């Protein structure tokens, strides 16, 4: 069994909010496997969920850019927030986002594309900026969405400048209807995605491994009730239905009007658009996602911003 260190216990406490002794026991029961320890605590009802996905550390900016029926969201990291507030760095990120629209959107394609202002590749332009600004930086992520007919709406939460911030969202809507009205509902849905971070557009599209992990946690929690297996099975199925509803975009309660699901809100918007609307894709980039940093309640922030 792996040695359980104080650092491991501290990390588990930060991720779950569980007590020190509970964290130590969870790590001991799972041979020091951090992810398994999180699930062990959840199964015992000691921790609700792994908090790490919303915790970030990398500085820099997320930028969005669109052209016609295509849009991109990119993340460029820097070492400090001071540099992220620098005009030269902001111009660089904005320029990279504009270049990215003309590519297939992958990091490799964007890095190799020509940056107009320098005549060099984006990758070499970043290297030059490192020498000029004096701080390491890199193009970390890039995602592009497009539709043949419709719009790709964009949204930056708490923008620090036009098209730049720490959380960026794209949502692709297919429709032959009025593009202005379509973009209006698209922006609202993008704001909703910023607030709720759905795992998939539809329940059936939720990653199978994620669903299986939740199911296993629910099974262990239900067994603690001491009820018969047939009752436990029904309990688990009910909780899984609720889980899918909560993490799939279209079945979520709409942040802007909680009386409607997102699907119902889009259906309602079809009246103004004048044609059916299909959600064809979505992307959400939170700066530094996956690295530890103080957590921010984006759901509360976005909801407050929407309600004015």
Curated annotation (Swiss-Prot):
Residues spanning the signal sequence: none
Keywords: Cytoplasm, Elongation factor, Protein biosynthesis
Keyword Cytoplasm attributed: yes
Positions of the UniProt region annotated as Involved in Mg(2+) ion dislocation from EF-Tu: 80-83
Listed GO CC annotations: cytoplasm
Record-level Gene Ontology MF annotations: translation elongation factor activity
Record localization: Cytoplasm
Keyword flag Cytoplasm: yes
Name of a matching Pfam family: EF_TS
Major localization listed first in the record, in broad terms: cytoplasm
NCBIfam families, per database record: tsf (TIGR00116)
HAMAP family hit by this protein: EF_Ts (MF_00050)
Family recorded in the similarity comment: Belongs to the EF-Ts family.
Function noted in UniProt: Associates with the EF-Tu.GDP complex and induces the exchange of GDP to GTP. It remains bound to the aminoacyl-tRNA.EF-Tu.GTP complex up to the GTP hydrolysis stage on the ribosome.
UniProt-recorded name of the protein: Elongation factor Ts
């Amino acid at each position: 069994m792996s040695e359980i260190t104080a650092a491991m216990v501290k990390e588990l406490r930060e991720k779950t909010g569980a007590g020190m002794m509970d964290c130590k026991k969870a790590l001991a029961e799972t041979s020091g496997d951090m992810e398994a320890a999180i699930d062990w605590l959840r199964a015992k009802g000691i921790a609700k969920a792994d908090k790490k996905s919303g915790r970030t550390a990398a500085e820099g900016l997320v930028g969005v850019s669109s052209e016609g029926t295509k849009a991109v969201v990119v993340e460029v990291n820097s070492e400090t927030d001071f540099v992220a507030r620098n005009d030269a760095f902001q111009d660089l990120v904005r320029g990279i986002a504009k270049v990215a629209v003309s590519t297939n959107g992958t990091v490799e394609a964007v890095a190799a594309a020509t940056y107009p202002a320098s005549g060099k590749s984006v990758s070499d332009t970043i290297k030059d900026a490192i020498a000029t600004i004096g701080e390491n930086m890199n193009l970390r992520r890039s995602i592009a969405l497009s539709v043949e007919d419709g719009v790709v709406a964009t949204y930056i939460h708490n923008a620090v400048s036009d098209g730049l911030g720490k959380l960026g969202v794209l949502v692709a809507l297919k429709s032959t209807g009025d593009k202005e009205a379509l973009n209006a509902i698209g922006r609202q849905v993008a704001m909703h995605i910023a607030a709720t971070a759905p795992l998939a557009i539809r329940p059936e599209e939720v990653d199978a491994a994620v669903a299986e992990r939740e199911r296993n946690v629910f099974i262990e929690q239900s067994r603690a009730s001491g009820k018969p297996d047939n009752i436990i099975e029904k309990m688990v199925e009910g909780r899984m239905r609720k889980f899918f509803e909560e993490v799939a975009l279209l079945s979520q309660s709409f942040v802007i009007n909680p009386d409607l699901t997102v699907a119902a809100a889009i259906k309602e918007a079809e009246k103004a658009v004048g044609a059916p609307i299909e959600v064809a894709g979505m992307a959400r980039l939170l700066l530094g996602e996956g690295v530890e940093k103080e957590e921010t309640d984006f759901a509360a922030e976005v909801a407050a911003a929407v309600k004015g």
